[in-house]
Amino acid sequence: MHSQQRPNPQMNRHPYGTPGSAPQMRRPGGFAGQPPQMHGPRMVAPPAAPLPKKKKYADKCIHPKIRELEPDAENYMALLASEQKLDSTLSRKKLDIQEALKRPSKVKKRLRIYISHTFIEEKQPEKDTDEASLPMWELRVEGRLLDEQPPAPAIPGQRPVPKRKFSSFFKSLVIELDKEMYGPDQHLVEWHRTPQTNETDGFQVKRAGDRPVKCRILLLLDNHPAKFKLHPRLAKVLGIATETRPKIIEALWQYIKTHGLQDPQERDIINCDTFLSQCFGVNRMRFMEVPNKLHQLLQQTDPLEFNHIIQRPKEGQEQVSTCYDIDVEMEDPVKQFMHTFVHSPGLANDIQTLDQKCYDIIEQINELKTRRDFYARFYTEPAEFIKSWVMSQNSDLKTMNELSGDLEAERFAESYVRPETEEGVQRYMFQKVNQKRHELEQSLGVRSN
């Protein structure tokens, strides 16, 4: 007989499977719930490390049998149900936010432009070796947002979002000076945006001179998406002068629907009225022709124009400054917070860490429940439990040693091949033959000699 082993409290599975679940596969080497036992010197190669199993919602749930033993477990299940509803709501909100981020959302801000100039007086040389400096003036074009909001909090690990600089609002800047005073080569100062442009908070222009100078400043706004100026006739028909291309097409479609210009028979044909005919030069056109014909009626928007006179300030006044307020369109600052909320990994990592703690605790609880069931069955039916345990050990031993047959019967097989056993079998068979012979003779009335 194999020696009976005491149950190891460090087991991982119940011998009969978890209550309420399907029977589990037993590992070779011991009764289910016991660590593998080595029978003989045979060594088994360690199995390859399994891939980490993806956790599911069911892995967080407490088994119903455990809830019967611990009433407070119902409170945990209620919290788990609330968490599932909250996760579902957050997932829907994130999808809504992601869709909102794809749509352009602009808000109008007030940009204040400061145009100022200063004069630098002529400097006489103090020494014979010094050079005299001519009188000069300096023109500055600067600006800032009046109602600028604080930037959205940066994603952890990234730099904070900087404030938007003045030059980022414009596509180009042209300062036109008096051509007669500065000649054809010096009367224009131009700046145009390029992909390599470094943003700045203002522009400075220096020129020699101390006489009053008239200058014209042209600023072209950098709109995203780009805006276009409509032809005067089309602008009068649609009621808009400057707008983006999608907005212009939308306004044109509304005009067509309102006035019933879509052909009732051929739905892809537009029957132009008098006003549209004057704009497009045709009486009928297809919808696919609208973008090309509309493109011919769109022009680049006009730049902002400011006239400024550079002249010496009055006595006691060092700098002359003029302010202009214009409306600019910017990305909705709420989108920055939305982007931070959707793409911030900090909260997701914290939630994942807490979820992993929950998985570990639930796994420990299930292991403790398995141990409890192990000892409870041993306490309730010790004989039946030991019998099942020995049978399980026997089955595991056969699987481990790759054996077949009944090991318990094979242990007593040697007694059947001993000489005394063979002699006993022959005596038994001889006795049985004589007994049958005697019974046959009696039935036939034959008297034996």
Swiss-Prot record:
InterPro entries according to UniProt: SWIB_domain, SWIB_MDM2_dom_sf, SWIB_MDM2_domain
PROSITE patterns membership: SWIB_MDM2
GO BP terms, alphabetized: chromatin remodeling; positive regulation of double-strand break repair; regulation of G1/S transition of mitotic cell cycle; regulation of mitotic metaphase/anaphase transition; regulation of nucleotide-excision repair; regulation of transcription by RNA polymerase II
Family the entry assigns: Belongs to the SMARCD family.
Location in or out of the cell: Nucleus, Nucleoplasm; Chromosome; Nucleus envelope
Superkingdom field: Eukaryota
Gene name of the encoded protein: swsn-2.2
Primary role: Involved in transcriptional activation and repression of select genes by chromatin remodeling (alteration of DNA-nucleosome topology). Component of SWI/SNF chromatin remodeling complexes that carry out key enzymatic activities, changing chromatin structure by altering DNA-histone contacts within a nucleosome in an ATP-dependent manner. Probably regulates vulva development through the let-60/Ras pathway. Involved in nuclear reassembly after mitosis and recruitment of nuclear envelope protein, mel-28, to the nuclear periphery in the early embryo and in the adult germline.
GO CC aspect terms: condensed chromosome; nuclear envelope; nucleoplasm; nucleus; SWI/SNF complex
Region (Disordered): 1-56
Residue stretches of biased makeup (Polar residues): 1-11
SWIB/MDM2 domain segment(s): 223-300
Disruption phenotype: Some knockouts exhibit maternal-effect embryonic or larval lethality. Germ lines are smaller. RNAi-mediated knockdown reduces brood size. Simultaneous knockouts of ham-3 do not survive beyond the L2 larval stage. Simultaneous RNAi-mediated knockdown of ham-3 at the L1 larval stage causes sterility, while at the L3 larval stage, causes embryonic lethality for the progeny. The sterile animals resulting from simultaneous RNAi-mediated knockdown of ham-3 at the L1 larval stage develop smaller germ lines.
SUPFAM superfamilies in UniProt: SWIB/MDM2 domain (SSF47592)
Pfam families: SWIB
Keywords: Chromatin regulator, Chromosome, Nucleus, Transcription, Transcription regulation
Quaternary state and interactors: Component of the multiprotein chromatin-remodeling complexes SWI/SNF: SWI/SNF-A (BAF), SWI/SNF-B (PBAF) and related complexes. The canonical complex contains a catalytic subunit swsn-4, core subunits swsn-1 and swsn-5, and accessory subunits swsn-3, swsn-6, phf-10, dpff-1, swsn-9 and either ham-3/swsn-2.1 or swsn-2.2.
UniProt name for this protein: SWI/SNF chromatin-remodeling accessory subunit 2
One GO molecular-function entry: transcription coregulator activity
